[in-house]
Amino acid sequence: MQTDFYEDRLRVFLEEFKKNTVAYSEKIEGFLYKPCEYKVGNELPVVDESFKSFEKNDRWGGKYDAHAWFYKKLIVPKELTGKNLELTVSTQLDGWDAVNPQFIAYVDGKLQQGLDVNHREIFLDNAKDEYDIFLYAYSGRNDCLLDFNVTLNAYYENARRLYYKIAVPYEVTLYHEPYEKVYVDIENYVVGAINLIDMRVPGSKEFLDSVDTAEAYLDREFYGKYCKKEDVNAVCIGHTHIDVAWLWTLAQTREKVLRSFSTVLELMKKYPEYKFMSSQAQLYKFLKEESPELYAEVKEMVRLGRWEVEGAMWVEADCNLSSGESLVRQILYGKSFFKNEFGVDSKVLWLPDVFGYSAALPQILRKSGVDKFVTSKIGWSETDKMPYDTFFWKGIDGTDIFTYFMTAQDKVRGKKPATNVTYNAKLNPCQLIGGYDRYQQKDINNEVMITFGYGDGGGGPIRKDLEYYDVLKKGVSGVPCAKMEFAGSFLERIKKRAEKNPKTPCWQGELYLEYHRGTYTSMAQNKKLNRRSEFLYENAEMLSVTAQKLLGKEYPREALHDGWETILLNQFHDIIPGSSIKEVYEVSHRQYEKICEAGKRIKNDAETAVAENINTRGGVLVFNPNSFEASGETKLDGKTVYVKNIPPKGYKVVTDVCNTNSVKVTDKFLENRFFKIKLDKTGAFSSLFDKKNKREVLKKGERGNVLTAYEDIPRDYDNWEISNYYTDKSWEVDSVVSIKPLSDGVRAGIEITRRFLSSTIVQRIWLYENTPKIDFENDIDWKESHILLKTAFPTEINADKATYDIQFGTVERPTHKNTSWDAAKFEVCAHKFADLSEYGYGVSLLNDCKYGYDIHDSVIRLTLIKCGNYPNPDADECRHEFTYSLFPHSGDFREAGTVKLAYLLNSPLEAKKIESQNGTLPEEYSLLSIDSENVICETVKNAEDGDGVIVRLYECCNSRANVNLTLGFDFDDVYLTDLLENEERKLQKHGRTVNLTLKPFEIVTLKLK
């Protein structure tokens, strides 16, 4: 019982003693106030009649995202001049820091620091007689009226210092059992110290002298003699995770950066050992644009070795949805910015809060000069716990990368560590002990990394963190010894340790987050714009190179770069996943509209320049943006036609254009030379017979292309989540309004209009004269909420795994639920296609903008719409236009050509009529060609340094390839480069041809000069 009394005694003592550290406190009134909009620049407003007196009972705010200025000429009492003072600001709203009222404090005209629920003090060290105080206030995501309270405080420095020296060891005992020796020992020393403190008259000479005596006792007996540094270290680095957008817009993110970074800089002045790390080049660019002066201060702290610039990427991007080339550009743009602005070569991919990690990443990282990967989000998996926290992660091509999972969490006495961890830790005994307890690789490493500080506008580390560090760095028994160190140097040390230790484990394949599966589908329009923009800008680059090489046309470097920056920005892990507020998507949509207009202009300018210079007798000019010779459908004068043998990354003037079809269509069946489809009364497939392969595609007794609506009310994180019980309640979308036949050039089909509640689903199903695929064009006016809409194809395929398209390759995933790990993958991410094949036959389901798949028990499902209502109450209640294609085939997806068909769906042939004309260019041209079926050229662009052309290839079938790459232009030299375009070695060439050997799923980048 006495031990319990000890804990209670210390708790109430510290509460009382903390009050007695205050030497002076006075409420400050008489502020002037002026509502405003978002400020532009750092010019302070003129204090004129537009400012009104803010009286004692006044309130401010009253709406979301309200802004205001507060001003006060502060007169410091004479007895306080020369002392260290603090001006404390509060709003009486103490909720979550990310959405609370926040301020930027300007002292004597200079932006000094941010203020928020965690950082309430404006530091006035060596106080002057008077100050001009401006506070730029932001109400947060609150529509309530807010208080505004300011006090001027002074403290007894020795008492405040002693407070922390007592509080830290006291907190250590809270995470040990009362019968442990360390608990008993600390109790004796701490009680001995507090018994020396005379609190009869706080502030008296007796009080202050007793404080000095107690501090000397602790320093001598406890910290000096008893405490020994533990063998376990907690490497600590200040951090503030700032979401580029989420529950706020990009405009507010700019302010969050100003507040957070200025607060860090201000605390650095007070705590010389304080080190801080921040990622995301985009945030630094925001800072540079908003406050060049503050940006210069950050650069100086980087130079002095106190501020760590790391992270590699432009933003902390979603790694499920971003394309392979986008991930390359994330790192290329991010690392280039850090190198050019700070002289830093970033070596760490820092993604603490991203919703899963593609198995293509290890190779992308390694070939970008990034050799370490850090996250913590994987600890949020709701079913299984990753067995490792320090390991080598092996990707689809066999490349491995050193990986470290952060493990900070609260320690709970008497309980085993929880699964969830945090990247917004507190530098206190609770989380240092909890972080090491949670860490699983103690047999190879005795250190953990703690990133401490409030995120998302919470302002980063607080004074308490840094005061605790001053105590914990001494080495307090019962808690890991705190050590301030950059993340990069810590990770490099642990990596070397792991490389030497044979016990270091390896994880092969994707790091699948068993959570947030709805992010593959939510906010479908945003995902569609991302997919369109990715292909548009790659094609615009390639065509610009074509026009440059053929005609000497200037390459639009700046416009292309700006467009890519916007694409990368919108791949932030709360924008593209669909988990932000409505206003974020309104801004994002405008940004996409702008860059799509610019990208189309660049592409069209290049195509037009080429077209105007072709020497031809006339016909149809067809451009093929893909890296393989293509025959397929395209639009000509609004009609679907079929063209043959269009050269890769090139064009051809053709005269043989097919524009008719022999497809048979009724309301009961569709038939061409490839398939015979029987329809039931709802328009679903009751049979799909593959005439070429003489087999039924659908499982006996089952129906294909059945649209099903599932109740989607996840247990939390509405727009993020799909909970596994969603299948318990569903409704078939079978209310048919009409079925009518369609004919369009080389294709024919039916249009089915269905109703579901208040929504209208129009689906056009097409069969083709020359291509063995079935297209489903969808035009949906969606009005529902909390519904998950899927299409399903139950196939007659026997396979225990399915193949999914990802960045620069594919992954296989189980179709069964044998283990909890298998069952947890009830919804997975893929890019352009997924395939289910048995030996000799299979079915691919392609798409032009969808990402969520579900293939189990031979049923292929594609998720079409998810419409939660938090944080966006109107999410996906809009028009949806998209296409998916069913491709039954002989062989597997490799033999069938699924990869090429998927590229053609997303990057189709383009045709236009061309009249007879004279010109300098031939009627047929290929910028490059590859003599291998399993190698794709993803990118052709000018080099970032302007010196040459970059060509990026990858092997797409998990097979080795010896290929000849033939270019359509002259070049003197060819170099193998990394993904950052650094030359690694010179290659031999034979005329315009380069011979290459690619390993399975290997990415190869060349520079031609």
PLM region descriptions:
Residues 1-40, 151-248, 533-646, 940:
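Histidine-centered catalytic/metal-binding microenvironments
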Residues 361-366, 374, 380, 389, ...:
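C-terminal (or distal) subdomains of carbohydrate-active enzymes
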Residues 296-306, 325, 358-417:
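Surface-exposed loop and adjacent secondary-structure segments within mature catalytic domains
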Residues 179-198, 202, 241, 245-247, ...:
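Catalytic grooves of carbohydrate-active enzymes
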Residues 328-355, 359-360, 367, 434-449:
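CE4/NodB-like, metal-dependent polysaccharide N-deacetylase domain
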Residues 63-79:
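Short beta-strands within extracellular/lumenal beta-sheet-rich domains
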Residues 200-208, 240-256, 279-288, 312-328, ...:
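The substrate-binding groove and active-site-proximal loops of carbohydrate-active enzymes
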Residues 2-14, 18-21, 75-78, 88-321, ...:
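N-terminal catalytic cores of secreted or lumenal carbohydrate-active enzymes
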